[in-house]
């Protein structure tokens, strides 16, 4: 088989994950371009400033893995990680205990308890459980999650049919304000996931994996879900909200900017959307510099050193046309945003410190 650009070194580098394949047999899922541009590439081993990761989860399976995570955090300059558990009850209590050896390095957030939501009085029970979790150590609530059918990111009981702007949610959101518990919420998915999975979709492989089925009865679409978030933010001005993943408005950051302009109680994390924003560096940089006071760093991609360093590479450098196939399923080249020092300080930890100290 003949490949015009397929040196032995490239073949060896991708052994086991990809291979040189003739174009007549090439499948998009096997497309692993290697940049041919001889441009500077910067290695960023640790963040330029201390970081609070505002979007992480309960990845470790043992105390030893928690210890290993701490070591990685030390080596990459992650000062603290927010563990979004979705959880209440016994599960939440067990996670508080799991991370209690490193109280200054982890904040453990709870979920909402939707048990008995089809019965009268469930909200009072949910508020009581929220208060209990707070007393147990919960610093915030999240990650709530609604991809169209309701608040399904909850353990042990999902909130089918309940959207964040449902009147039944208001007592919970008001209690969050009273207890100074910020609310982290994922609404919708990015626009690619609502498009046809065909040759016109430029995020095809990733969008096909996460495609939203709008034929399901009662499901809300992207704009309806963002509207539900806006309603909740507007109707609960004393509650602090963090919209996960740029509110899934990566293809139209202006929509998020309009919300920032209207609602001072709204923030957004940048977790797990590096591959969506890095292909448009000038547009993204201008947005992030303008709204530097409203964005917080997040990962949502595990605990590896390489993962953290990829995020720093994108945020801190001006490097051009590189790929990270191990972490991102798109086929777009990535570009560094080269954010200013002031913006990095705010996104890495300044805004997060303000949110969790309010």
Question: Each PLM stretch: what is its role?
Answer:
Residues 35, 62-63, 70, 223-231, ...:
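H/E-rich (His + Asp/Glu) clusters that bind or coordinate divalent metals
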Residues 22, 27, 39-42, 93-211:
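Active-site gating/metal-coordination segments in enzymes
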Residues 52-56, 80-83, 106-111, 141-143, ...:
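Hydrophobic faces of well-ordered beta-strands that scaffold small-molecule active sites
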Residues 21-104:
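An N-terminally biased module of ancient metal coordination in phosphate/nucleic-acid-related enzymes
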Residues 59-62, 88-91, 115-116, 147-151, ...:
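Active-site environment of divalent metal-dependent phosphoester hydrolases
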Residues 6-17:
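Bacterial N-terminal signal peptides
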